[in-house]
Amino acid sequence: MSDNLSASQEKTPHERMQARLTVAALVQWQGRFLVVEEEIKGQRRFNQPAGHVEAGEDLLTAACRELKEETGLTATPTSWLGTYLYKPADSEATYVRTAIIFDLEKAPGQHHPEDPDGDILACHWLTLEEIAECKPALRSPLVWQCIEDYLAGTRLPLSALKAFIQS
């Protein structure tokens, strides 16, 4: 350490966060929310249909793909709910999750997930109360936060999501 710098002023290298870019689909139908039941590290977890953005995808395309893969549903994205940063205490990973609100054009039927990752156990339409009962088994606090934001009326325009993907 230089004689001119105190211990609190000593320059230290900044560690850069390595974020994992993910999307989630929030779908509500007649007072029930669509959740997927997954197996993560041998434990049952509940989540919105969600996953990683793949190379070359924009956020809306990724959210539509994840919804289709995990539930078999095709729906219309209507609003951007928000973007959330999550750093679990038990992991080195940091997640940046963009949540998109989808509207169903007709009543949901049977779910036939494509599930290329093989971790979806089932799809459920749960009330807020049922999700609250599952809180300890939610995949992350983002699941509940997205529902709270949705119920609070948060709606951002999809046109605010910009993508500049160069090949």
Describe these PLM feature segments:
Residues M1-A24:
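Acidic, metal-coordinating catalytic segment for phosphate/diphosphate chemistry
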Residues Q43-F46, D117-S167:
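Nudix hydrolase/Nudix homology domain
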Residues A24, R32, A122:
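Conserved beta-strand and immediately adjacent loop positions that scaffold enzyme active sites
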Residues R20, Q28, Q48, A75, ...:
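Short connector loops at helix/strand junctions that flank enzyme active sites
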Residues W29-E69:
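Conserved Nudix-box catalytic region and its N-terminal flanking loop in Nudix hydrolases
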Residues V53-T76, Y86-R139:
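Unchanged
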